[in-house]
Amino acid sequence: MMDNNEPISAEHGQAGENLAMNYLLEQGLTFIERNVRFKFGEIDLVMKNGKEWIFVEVKYRSKSQYGGAINALSSGQIKRLRRAAEHYMQLNNIDAICRFDLIAVDAGQIQWLPNAF
């Protein structure tokens, strides 16, 4: 049985990211990049909506027990994602509005929270 705090496999994580990316593409967002890694944090998906840059954290749970994916985001993860996004924008000379979205995938059900944090 998977505990809510137990890490999920990379394979399941990729499946969740694929579902999230396809969902966001269907909503009209533009895909830029995925799995951007820095030593201090990772960005699951980088998307755009017009001129707005969107940094997406994807949380996946195969079962919705223990509060589900939507409750799996910690304050430490938020801090690391914000730092990674800031670094990404500096490296790519991006001077634009950005936001942070959360995609929660629970047992195949997708919940999108724009401006989640």
Swiss-Prot record:
HAMAP family: UPF0102 (MF_00048)
Coiled coil spans: none
Species this chain originates from: Shewanella sediminis (strain HAW-EB3)
The family this protein is said to belong to: Belongs to the UPF0102 family.
Molecular-function GO terms, alphabetical: nucleic acid binding
Lineage: Bacteria, Pseudomonadati, Pseudomonadota, Gammaproteobacteria, Alteromonadales
Pfam families the record matches: UPF0102
Superkingdom, taxonomy of origin: Bacteria
Name of the protein this chain belongs to: UPF0102 protein Ssed_4252
